[in-house]
Structures are given as structure tokens and as C-alpha cells.
Regions:
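Short beta->alpha connector loops
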Residues: 32, 154-158, 212
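Primarily the HKD phosphodiesterase
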Residues: 139-196
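HKD (HxKxxxxD) catalytic microenvironment of the phospholipase D
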Residues: 207-249, 257
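Basic, Lys/Arg-rich alpha-helical nucleic-acid-recognition elements, primarily the DNA-binding modules
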Residues: 1-91
Length: 270
């Protein structure tokens, strides 16, 4: 079978999604091989409707039949994986719609945008008119739990840096790795207290981005990740945060951190 072009794949994906039955059949058969009775019981639809959908999928080489049992072909399996990911991405964005819609996402690489479904169990916290510091307070309380932290620091914020230094000083925070911009790094370097207690701290590793731009604030420990973003007008927003404590969410966050780490140079202590 010849390889399909991206345009052909898009058209076929759209064709699948325009039918609830076709979509349900692909997802159902992703679990295991099934016969008509299995599919009737699961989908609660008449045999004629199910058979029509199966025939359409067979014609597209997504489903095959053997001894009255239906299963996905290799192409069907790939389609199912992409379909499930697409649905989970949509769900992940929908449940935290206010967070994603109101911010600049250009700092998130395409690969992680495509895997945003891994944040589907994130907790969204937003400050309110009666509690303007709710998001920031939640963040400060969160990092107090951490023995190790990875932080992508896009802004020079004394509130955040002072809290980090406090945790380093009382030794509750044992390891800290920071990725930041050249501008933020120089601001830290020109601050005597921060230079002494942060830049020259043996428990701290700092990486400076070669491109002087960072559009997200990400913090990761072994137990949680926390994401804040910028508004579309370029201003940093500390009033909305996304906290994730799942293995999937941590994987997503660490992949994002590693992406930016590859674009950085390590600061060598004097």
C-alpha cells in the first residue's frame, strides 16, 4: 500500500470524525478484536448500522474481518492512537479553556502542544477579586514541599527568588536547577545578595538561554509541576496557574524543560 500524504490523512481523519459511529468503532476495536454481538452490546446500536460503519472502515483499510471477528489493521491502529490523542487533547484544553485561551502559547514547542493531553488532570487555580494573590500563594505553598526543583524563570521577580533562597537557606530545598534568559541572569548577577547566595550556591545549577526569550514560567519537582504563562500582549500573568501531580504531567513538563535546556549554556561558577 502506498504511503498517504498529509492531506490525504487529514481528509480521512476528518471523515472519521464526522461520524460518531465510525469514531466509536475505531476506538472500540482499539481495545481488542470483537464480533458484531460484542459491538452491538457495547454501542447499543442495530447490526445494520454497525455493519455499515465497519464496511466504510474496511474500504479505507482501517478494519479487517477474520472468522466473524473484526480488528484494526496496522493503519487502523495508528489512526486509533492519533484519534484518542486528539480527543484527549481537546478534552484537556476544554476543561482548562480559560487558562489556554487567555495566554500566549508560542513558548510551547509543537511536540508538547500535540501532547497537551498529558495535562488533562491538571488543577487550574485563578486569583479572584476577593483573593488577588490566590495563585501566587498556592505556588509558594507548593514549592515548600519540594526537595528538588527545576525552574524556568522568564522574569526577574524578587518575590519568587527570595522564596527560593529561603528554601535553600533552611535546607528544605536541596537541589535547584534554573533555566533563564540573559537579561534575568544579569539582573541576578548584579544583585549582591542573589549573586552570593544563588549564583555561587553549590546546590544550584543555572543555564542561560542563547536566545534571550522565554515565554513561560515552569516549576517541576519529583511530585508536581506548575505552569504559568504570559498574556498575548507580552505581560507575565501570575494570576493563573496550572498544577499537575500526575506521572503524565511530570513527563510533559520534564520534556519541555529538557527542550529549553538544550537551547541553553550552563553557567560556570567562579
Amino acid at each position: 500500500m502506498k504511503n498517504k500524504t498529509g492531506n490525504e490523512e487529514f481528509k480521512e481523519m476528518r471523515y472519521i470524525l464526522t461520524s460518531t459511529m465510525r469514531t466509536k468503532l475505531i476506538i472500540s476495536l482499539y481495545d481488542k478484536t470483537k464480533n458484531i454481538q460484542d459491538l452491538r452490546n457495547e454501542l447499543d446500536k442495530p447490526s445494520a448500522t454497525i455493519l455499515h460503519g465497519l464496511k466504510e472502515l474496511e474500504n479505507l483499510s482501517y478494519v479487517k474481518k477474520l472468522n466473524k471477528y473484526y480488528s484494526l489493521t496496522s493503519n487502523g491502529h495508528i489512526l486509533a492512537v492519533n484519534l484518542i490523542k486528539l480527543i484527549e487533547n481537546w478534552y484537556s484544553i476544554k476543561i482548562n479553556k480559560q487558562f489556554w485561551d487567555s495566554h500566549d502559547l508560542s513558548g510551547i514547542p509543537k511536540r508538547e502542544i500535540q501532547n497537551i493531553y498529558k495535562l488533562k488532570n491538571s488543577e487550574y487555580i485563578s486569583s479572584t477579586t476577593t483573593d488577588l494573590s490566590k495563585a501566587l500563594t498556592s505556588y509558594m505553598e507548593l514549592i515548600e514541599e519540594a526537595e528538588n526543583l527545576k525552574i524556568m524563570l522568564p522574569v526577574f521577580s524578587e518575590i519568587h527568588i527570595d522564596k527560593i533562597m529561603e528554601l535553600l537557606k533552611n535546607r528544605s530545598l536541596k537541589e535547584l536547577e534554573i533555566i533563564t534568559t540573559e537579561d534575568v541572569f544579569h539582573s541576578i548577577e548584579n544583585h549582591p545578595k542573589y549573586k552570593t547566595n544563588l549564583l555561587n550556591n553549590e546546590s544550584v545549577r543555572i543555564h542561560v538561554l542563547r536566545k534571550n526569550e522565554l515565554k513561560l514560567f515552569l516549576s517541576i519537582s519529583s511530585k508536581f509541576s506548575c505552569l504559568t504563562l504570559f498574556f498575548n500582549d507580552g505581560h507575565y500573568d501570575d494570576s493563573q496557574i496550572l498544577i499537575d501531580r500526575t506521572e503524565e504531567g511530570l513527563e510533559w513538563s520534564n520534556n519541555l524543560f529538557d527542550h529549553y535546556k538544550e537551547l541553553s549554556d550552563k553557567y560556570e561558577k567562579c
